[in-house]
Amino acid sequence: MSERIEKIMTVGITGASGGMYGVRLTQELLRQEYKVHLVLTEAAWQVFKEELLLDTTDRQKVIHELFGDLPGELHTHDLHDYAAPIASGSYRSAGMVIIPCSMGTLSGMAHGASGNLLERTADVMLKEKRKLVIVPRETPLHDIHLENMLKLSKMGATILPAMPGYYHLPKTIDDLINFLVGKALDSLGVEHTLFTRWGE
């Protein structure tokens, strides 16, 4: 029995500040019963420890605490597992989002390095002309950062900087997180009610 391709997504979380963006987006996909392939870099685990104040000694326990009670299907992959299904273009999915995306990962993707599973899967999205949403989180940006974003945009990726809007009158940090996650989901074509849209 074939899977519904439109309900399969890959999420990458890197060591850029803002790990909660990736957590919230993954949670929302799972709530909507998506099959999610999750790849975290080593630096992402450090961010989980520093920003989310999580004890990352037992990583499987952390994954269960963050996502275990949600109805979707979660598959976590080692950063260097090139045998993972998402490393191949023959494995079909609706798209991929890297949220937040560090400048190191951005550079690897822009130059086709495929130095780890995250970069390889992004390379697959580009070559197969599938949705790839990149949420860079860095400030300020120098020329190489900007050139890499432009290069990826020209190859078909959506560059969605971690810049929350304020027209929805956010009252909490959660409101700001939900806005950005909602914009990323919009770019992936995923319905949601994470923020009030302009004119609603």
Curated annotation (Swiss-Prot):
Residues engaged in binding dimethylallyl phosphate: 167, 183
Binding site for FMN: 15-17, 41, 102-105, 137
Coiled-coil stretches noted in the UniProt entry, renumbered to this chain: none
EC number, UniProt record: 2.5.1.129
Lineage: Bacteria, Bacillati, Bacillota, Bacilli, Bacillales
Top-level class of the enzyme under EC nomenclature: transferase
Similarity comment: family membership: Belongs to the UbiX/PAD1 family.
The reaction(s) this protein catalyses: dimethylallyl phosphate + FMNH2 = prenylated FMNH2 + phosphate
Molecular function GO labels: carboxy-lyase activity; flavin prenyltransferase activity
Function: Flavin prenyltransferase that catalyzes the synthesis of the prenylated FMN cofactor (prenyl-FMN) for 4-hydroxy-3-polyprenylbenzoic acid decarboxylase UbiD. The prenyltransferase is metal-independent and links a dimethylallyl moiety from dimethylallyl monophosphate (DMAP) to the flavin N5 and C6 atoms of FMN.
Pfam family, one: Flavoprotein
Name the UniProt record assigns to this protein: Flavin prenyltransferase UbiX
UniProt xrefs under HAMAP family: ubiX_pad
Keyword annotations from UniProtKB, A to Z: Flavoprotein, FMN, Prenyltransferase, Transferase
Entry superkingdom: Bacteria
